[in-house]
């Protein structure tokens, strides 16, 4: 079994409070993917991001996820590897972006803050990520073009749920 991070999240459209039992079920369904660290962040009553971490590039705790952008507006959960993150980082630093980690997650997040969905045009690698924009109250879901890193989602009249594994969505009961 190849290890990799696990990502997931829940968004209740009617803004009702997320049941913590459900997010714990989702996290527990993904913990085998990321043995190094796991966390659920409730960004509001109705928005939760979940991450189980397999630390590869930056082992520092500051690279734990979900991660929040410098502007405090955006939050990310990310699974994968951005091969050209050092080049992207240099470009962003030349535009005044300051980084607090050495890994590719923060680079990806700040690149999204700078370029929006156009960030997909500059990324090289294998990835699945979701960014929540607290100002717009919206999600941006993306994965690499080949689909090396999985990202599944389900939308119904009540909520959006996404995950690295279908099993986590099914286990949630949503």
Where are these predicted regions, by residue range?
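Cysteine-centered catalytic environments shared across enzyme families
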Residues: 2-174
């Amino acid at each position: 079994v190849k290890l990799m991070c696990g990502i997931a999240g829940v968004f209740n459209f009617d803004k009702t409070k997320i049941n913590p039992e459900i997010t714990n079920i989702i996290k527990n369904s993904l913990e085998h993917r990321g043995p190094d660290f796991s966390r659920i962040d409730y960004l509001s009553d109705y928005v939760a991001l979940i991450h189980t971490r397999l630390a590869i590039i930056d082992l520092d705790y500051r690279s734990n996820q979900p991660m929040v952008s410098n502007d405090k507006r955006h939050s990310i959960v990310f699974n994968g590897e951005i091969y050209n993150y050092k080049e992207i980082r240099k470009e962003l630093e030349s535009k005044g972006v300051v980084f607090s980690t050495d890994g590719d997650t923060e680079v990806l997040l700040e690149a999204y803050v700078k370029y929006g969905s156009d960030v997909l045009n500059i990324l090289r690698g294998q990835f699945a990520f979701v960014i929540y924009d607290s100002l717009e109250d919206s999600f941006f879901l993306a994965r690499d073009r080949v689909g090396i890193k999985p990202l599944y989602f389900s939308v119904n009249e009540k909520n959006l749920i996404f995950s690295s594994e279908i099993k986590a969505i099914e286990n949630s009961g949503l």
